[in-house]
Amino acid sequence: RSLRAPGVQEFKWSPCGYDTKNGGIERNGGTPVLSYWSPEKEEDSTPASIRLIAIPERTVLRTITRSMVDRVELHWQPRGEYLAVQVLRHKKSKKTHYTNFEIFRMKNLHKDIAVEHFKQTEEVSQFRWEPNGNRFAYIYGDSSTKGNVDVYTMGDASNKGKMEMLYTIENRQANRLFWSPMGNFLVIAGLDNINGQLEFWDTDNEQSMSTQEHFMCNQICWDPSGRVCCTAVCQPMMFGSMSMRYQLENGFKLWTFQGAPM
């Protein structure tokens, strides 16, 4: 049977199931959760909505609404403990944009789902969860000149589970973020039109381990162990000057997790 979701723009499934009666995450089984968003309707002043629904019960777990919304992106943490909703909003003039984040804590579905909010006054170009941890990072500002990267934690026993910003990595030519599968190590990259600027960052120690360049790099991939990172210039499957441009630099490089060439 179809699920009614008028005007839905995007939906994403949770990466795991949940115990909706007692709380907690179930890696094998449990109730999956569907998240989706629908845009606002100016003709009848209906705001944009983000909704979480338990399937197959079709129980609405949480709904939030926002006005003056241009775009929404849904980011599930790989372990399913959190859902980050990135909301690009405009002011009444529609000339100025800013970003709101709504972070859903998913561990206690048997209670009301807690949602944390914060605002970034500039447009965010990319958001990424740490795969094996409780941190996230995002890029904002003009990445073609000098953008910034903010690193947050969702909290642990050391700070009583409080979400807080850890620090800002300032003035980086970057438009993509690539976490190691094991967490902690992060590649801050400027791909495509930024021509392959690479910085290997140690999140725990808040320090840059290495700055490198792979000219015209447009793809980055970590090996599953998190020990090796591969950067590549991949030729688009098309004809014309764009394809020829990448063909001249086609190839790959391997780096240690610290950013040393292999």
Task: Give the ranges of each region predicted by the language model.
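Multi-bladed beta-propeller domains
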Residues: 1-10, 55-70, 106-123, 155-173, ...
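Conserved beta-propeller blade repeats
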Residues: 5-27, 69-80, 116-135, 168-182, ...
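Short, conserved, GDST-rich strand-edge loop motifs in beta-rich repeat architectures
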Residues: 28-43, 86-99, 141, 232-250
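Hydrophobic beta-strand positions that form the internal "hydrophobic ladder"
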Residues: 34, 80-83, 136, 183-186, ...
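Beta-propeller blade signature
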Residues: 48-56, 98-109, 150-156, 198-202, ...
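Extended repeat-based solenoid scaffolds, especially LRR ectodomains
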Residues: 50-56, 63-65, 73-74, 78-86, ...
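Short amphipathic alpha-helices and their capping/turn residues within compact interaction modules
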Residues: 79-81, 85-88, 106, 132, ...
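Loop/turn-rich, solvent-exposed surfaces of beta-rich toroidal or solenoidal domains
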Residues: 172-203, 207, 211-240, 244
